[in-house]
């Protein structure tokens, strides 16, 4: 049977949504693991990751049920939501890949000033204090404060990894963006195909 057939379209759509389900569970698991082992203390960051995971899980569930049952309404809404997610994710991925070092520094500084718990995590894990300079009046949880060694600012250390992280996130985002547009195309084809097991006189 050619891959344009009903069964092949159904199987491909089910496999794609199973992939999204695994990714969503992985996101939720990583967030829970990070806060469980004390690597992340920011409830805002964990909440965002878990919310994205749950949202992706619900989308995958709608797509999976729609594909198995060949449900026209579910497939329609799944296709629309997936298209909107593709537009947002593709835009964010391109922005991640297009940021230069100066823009990365400005973005990191904004995040540094607005998230106290994440700032404390960075200072503790990277053993640094302050963003661009060390202020002795600020609270710092880095171990270098208790030792005789002087603490370094965090901006140069974060800057070493920021570009690589943004390229990695942008690349992964682009990959999943193309899987989403593939999902939209598969859903459109599958939705307009007739189930060979259905009653030939039934209305699609």
UniProtKB/Swiss-Prot annotation:
Q: Highest taxon of the source?
A: Eukaryota
Q: Which GO terms describe its molecular function?
A: calcium channel regulator activity
Nuclease is among the record's keywords: no
- Glycan-carrying positions: 113, 137
Alphabetized, the UniProt keywords read: Glycoprotein, Membrane, Phosphoprotein, Transmembrane, Transmembrane helix
For this record, the Gene Ontology CC terms, alphabetical, are: membrane; plasma membrane
Protein's recorded name: Tetraspanin-13
Species assigned in the record: Homo sapiens
């Amino acid at each position: 049977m050619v891959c344009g057939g009903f069964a092949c379209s159904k199987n491909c759509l089910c496999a794609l949504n199973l992939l999204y389900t695994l990714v969503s569970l992985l996101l939720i698991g990583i967030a829970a693991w990070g806060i469980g082992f004390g690597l992340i203390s920011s409830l805002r960051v964990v909440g965002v990751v878990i919310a994205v995971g749950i949202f992706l899980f619900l989308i995958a569930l709608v797509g999976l049920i729609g594909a198995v049952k060949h449900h026209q309404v579910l497939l329609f809404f799944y296709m629309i939501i997936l298209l909107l997610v593709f537009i947002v994710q593709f835009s964010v991925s391109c922005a991640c890949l297009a940021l230069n070092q100066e823009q990365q520094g400005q973005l990191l500084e904004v995040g540094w000033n607005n998230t106290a718990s994440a700032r404390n995590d960075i200072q503790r894990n990277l053993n640094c204090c302050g963003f661009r300079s060390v202020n002795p009046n600020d609270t710092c949880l880095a171990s270098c404060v208790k030792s005789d060694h002087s603490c370094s600012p965090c901006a140069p250390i974060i800057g070493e990894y920021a570009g690589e992280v943004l390229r990695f996130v942008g690349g992964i985002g682009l990959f999943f963006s193309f899987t989403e547009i593939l999902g939209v195309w598969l859903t459109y084809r599958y939705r307009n195909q007739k189930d060979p097991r259905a009653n030939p006189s039934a209305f699609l």
